[in-house]
């Protein structure tokens, strides 16, 4: 897998904590002269070479790596009550312990194999575990149970509980995706693979664990310990040895209790950590959906309970995979072939979508100063069966500009007292911004839970919608551009380019950028807290964000908040709301 020699591994392990090391010490470890170290370092893998920084005779890595030396690992194991083996490279750490379990099952108990590179690393259902050197903490260990294999079906979820406890001890908030993935929101942090050997009336369980230590650039939807450590505002860097020792301590304590009492004492903790509890999911086998429904929980055997349209279902892990059900909530299709042009007249831009057979065909947008793209599309696509429906907060002059591009009357729809089963609690619905109303109606294509609906445009609106169809109102604040503009006009020294967002900004530009984003995120989280309290009973409250700044706001929300809640970015939410309304059964509006 690599051409690294023992000297490379020694030097890399010495630098892995990210702290400065003098070149004389590193040269002794590599058995060479200090001036030879640069050539020696060029033999490291490319993604490792670029991490090196040199200053005044000291070397350090810009971020720590999950790389160990045998002696340090042995001492760690002794403190934790485990025998250790270090394999810089192997086929699979699970295979190493499985082989030991078949030869000497008693020796496999609490023997841990740590590896840096695996050629045949795998997860559940034989999936390949992708990683690069130093990016992932990977280890396997054996545990002997006086039980048959069929009684250990809940071992993988209980191992996930132990890992989550360890991460929590380090200040890192994570969740569990059934049965045993460690996740942060939709991003995967780690996985667990359980394999067993039955011998001599006992079962040796081999527990393989892989946790992303550094964020893997080549893997989508991934989280890492290092990134969580930084966003949790912890000082210094994450340390792989501390992480491993904390994991072993929790695994030891949890598995001792599990061997005695089973999974029952851990069910409540697992339920609280389950990312998808109370949410819609799909269960797949070989890529095909076999169940879809709402997660109701797990039982004392780790079996998943699902509420489906056909009734209650129970699912054991086996070869089943779970996915969040992200499909937009369907709306009835019109029975005729009428086509629509839907318009969203915002303050600064016009957006539009052509709808055919209940779905978007094409979408577009343009500033009001040049709406010719809309006129060109109209000339190209119009026929006798196009109905134009819109929502506008842009004012009468801009609405007239839009009308000039279209040779047919536009039906501009206002807010209303109710529509599509949603009651509007605004005191005077006629004063209610229609974009906020149609954002609320559009959110139902993405979630049936209670929702905080956020629109990031010229203004930022943060609205509350209950799961039983009550629009409670919400807040309005200046958008990012208006906040920046007001600071420029009303202050003497803040008329400068906004910088970047930082936890503790140390320049004025960065302070402005961070303050604006904190204001928006704080507003979202306060509304979420109020709606969560009102909804009660542990029900989920989702966040749906739309508008030009939506993605940045979603990224800026605290990791703990993202881990505990569903946050979705939805483009063109107003247009989705218009589509929901016109697609109601028979095309007749409930708008009253």
From Swiss-Prot:
Binding note for cofactor: A monovalent cation. Ammonium or potassium.
Protein name in UniProt: Bifunctional enzyme BirA/CoaX
PROSITE patterns reported in the protein's UniProt record: BPL_LPL_CATALYTIC (PS51733)
Stretches for region Biotin--protein ligase: 1-329
BPL/LPL catalytic domain location: 83-259
Active site location: 435 (proton acceptor)
Catalytic activity line of the entry: biotin + L-lysyl-[protein] + ATP = N(6)-biotinyl-L-lysyl-[protein] + AMP + diphosphate + H(+); (R)-pantothenate + ATP = (R)-4'-phosphopantothenate + ADP + H(+)
Organism: Neisseria meningitidis serogroup A / serotype 4A (strain DSM 15465 / Z2491)
């Amino acid at each position: 897998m690599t051409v690294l020699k023992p000297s490379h591994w020694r030097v890399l392990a010495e630098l892995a904590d990210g702290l400065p090391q003098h070149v004389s010490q590193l040269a002794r470890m590599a058995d060479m002269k200090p001036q030879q170290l640069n050539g020696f370092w060029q033999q490291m893998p490319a993604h490792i070479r670029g991490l090196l920084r040199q200053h005044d005779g000291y070397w350090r890595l810009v971020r720590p790596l999950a790389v160990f030396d045998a002696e340090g690992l042995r001492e760690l194991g002794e403190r934790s009550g485990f025998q250790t083996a270090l394999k810089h490279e192997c086929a699979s750490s699970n295979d190493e312990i499985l082989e030991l379990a078949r030869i000497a099952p008693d020796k496999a108990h609490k023997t841990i194999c740590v590896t840096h590179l695996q050629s045949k690393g795998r997860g559940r259902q034989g999936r390949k575990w992708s990683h690069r050197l130093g990016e992932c903490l990977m280890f396997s260990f054996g545990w002997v149970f006086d039980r048959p294999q069929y009684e250990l079906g809940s071992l993988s979820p209980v191992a996930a509980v132990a890992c989550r406890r360890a991460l929590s001890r380090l200040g890192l908030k994570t969740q569990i995706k059934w049965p045993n993935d460690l996740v942060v929101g939709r991003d995967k942090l780690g996985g667990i693979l359980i394999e067993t050997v039955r011998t001599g009336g006992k079962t040796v369980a081999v527990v393989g664990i892989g946790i992303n230590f550094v964020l893997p650039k080549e893997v989508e939807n991934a989280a890492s310990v290092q990134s969580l450590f930084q966003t949790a505002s912890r000082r210094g860097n994450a340390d792989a040895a501390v992480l491993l020792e904390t994991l072993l301590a929790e695994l030891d304590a949890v598995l001792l209790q599990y061997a005695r009492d089973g999974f029952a004492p851990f069910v409540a903790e697992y339920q609280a950590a389950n990312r998808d509890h109370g949410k819609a999911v799909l269960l797949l086998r070989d890529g095909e959906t076999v169940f879809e429904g709402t997660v109701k929980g797990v039982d004392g055997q780790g079996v998943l309970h699902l509420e489906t349209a056909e009734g209650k279902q129970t699912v054991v892990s086996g070869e089943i995979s779970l996915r969040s059900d992200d499909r937009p909530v369907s709306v009835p299709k019109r029975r005729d072939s009428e086509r629509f042009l839907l318009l969203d007249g915002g303050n600064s831009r016009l957006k539009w979508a052509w709808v055919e057979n209940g779905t978007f065909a094409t979408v577009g947008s343009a500033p009001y100063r040049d709406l010719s793209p809309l006129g060109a599309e109209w000339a190209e696509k119009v026929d006798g069966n196009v109905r134009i429906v819109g929502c506008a907060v842009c004012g009468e002059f801009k609405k007239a500009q839009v009308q000039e591009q279209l040779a047919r009357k536009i039906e501009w729809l206002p807010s209303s007292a109710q529509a599509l089963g949603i009651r509007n609690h605004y005191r005077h619905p006629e004063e209610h911004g229609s974009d906020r109303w149609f954002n609320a109606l559009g959110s139902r294509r993405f979630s049936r839970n209670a929702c905080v609906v956020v629109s990031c445009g010229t203004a930022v609106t943060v609205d509350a919608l209950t799961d039983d169809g009550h629009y409670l109102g919400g807040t309005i604040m200046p958008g990012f551009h208006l906040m920046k503009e007001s600071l420029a006009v009303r202050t003497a020294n803040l008329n400068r380019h906004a910088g970047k967002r930082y936890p503790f900004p140390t320049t004025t530009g960065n302070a402005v950028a961070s303050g604006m984003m904190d204001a928006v995120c704080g507003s979202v989280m306060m509304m979420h807290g109020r709606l969560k309290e009102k909804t009660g009973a542990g029900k989920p409250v989702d966040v749906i964000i739309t508008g030009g700044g939506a993605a940045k706001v979603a990224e800026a929300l605290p990791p703990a908040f993202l881990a505990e809640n569903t946050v979705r970015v939805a483009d063109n939410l107003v247009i989705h709301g218009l589509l929901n309304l016109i697609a109601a059964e028979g095309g007749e509006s409930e708008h009253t």
